Amino acid sequence: ERARGLGDVYKRQISKILSIGIPAGVENGMFQFGKLAIQSTESTLGTQAIAAQALAIVLENLNGIASMGVGISLMTVAGQTFGAGRTEEGKYYIVKLTWYGEIGLILSCLLTFAVGRPIMYLAGMEPESMRMCYEMLVAITIAKPLLWALGFIPAYGLRAAGDVKFSMIVSICTMWFCRVALAIYLIRFQGFGPIAVWIGMFADWGIRSIIFSIRFMSGKWMEKHVI
């Protein structure tokens, strides 16, 4: 009888773990498929555009390290507070760490922009590739501090509270309808260069920011429970 009771407890725990892990895995898998779709379209732009885009992605990843770290830490902090039933404290940390992430993002973007051109020279890029890469870096430096933080950092807190299905649906829809579809349309039908990928990405970030802000303020995500 005791073994059966422990088995039921373990089953409930495993089902709760899977209820978080499976949507997160699906979200990440769809994201990788989306990246492949974009890269296949980028390959039609020529080697100079591909080289410019490759370095722009590296620089964009570099300026997002600090904020991404804040988001990951938020998942841990928020998970502990919501798990202990301290909902208001969890909301406080979501807001506070989102602001910290925004400040870190602004500083990181400015620093990356300052060292961007020297890195391009060190990479030995051709003039045309350097021009395209610099244009993309300027666009990223302007758009990312405005759009990224609200679209990603609060989502970590919502996932920690158990609102994983909503996050998965939003992420997949914005990924495919904004980032992928818009980029492919601009490149294949409007003749845009690699900047089209970033226009699609900015649209993705902006719509995510609006949706997750509305979701957070509505309080519906607090109706979800992990334990």
Cite the ranges covered by each PLM segment.
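Short membrane-interface helical motifs at transmembrane helix boundaries
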Residues: 107-134
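Small-residue-rich hydrophobic transmembrane alpha-helices
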Residues: 50-116, 148-171
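Alpha-helical transmembrane segments of multi-pass membrane proteins
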Residues: 59-61, 127-151
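Single conserved hydrophobic/aromatic residue that forms the stacking wall/gate
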Residues: 1-10
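Helix-terminus/linker motif at the lipid-water interface of multi-pass membrane proteins
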Residues: 29-62, 80, 118-127, 185-189
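Membrane-interface helix-loop junctions in multi-pass transport and translocation proteins
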Residues: 4, 116-118, 131, 175-210, ...
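Hydrophobic faces of transmembrane alpha-helices in multi-pass small-molecule transporters and flippases
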Residues: 11-37, 41, 62, 66, ...
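Short runs within selected transmembrane alpha-helices of multi-pass transporters and secretion channels
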Residues: 68-71, 140-160, 166-178, 182, ...
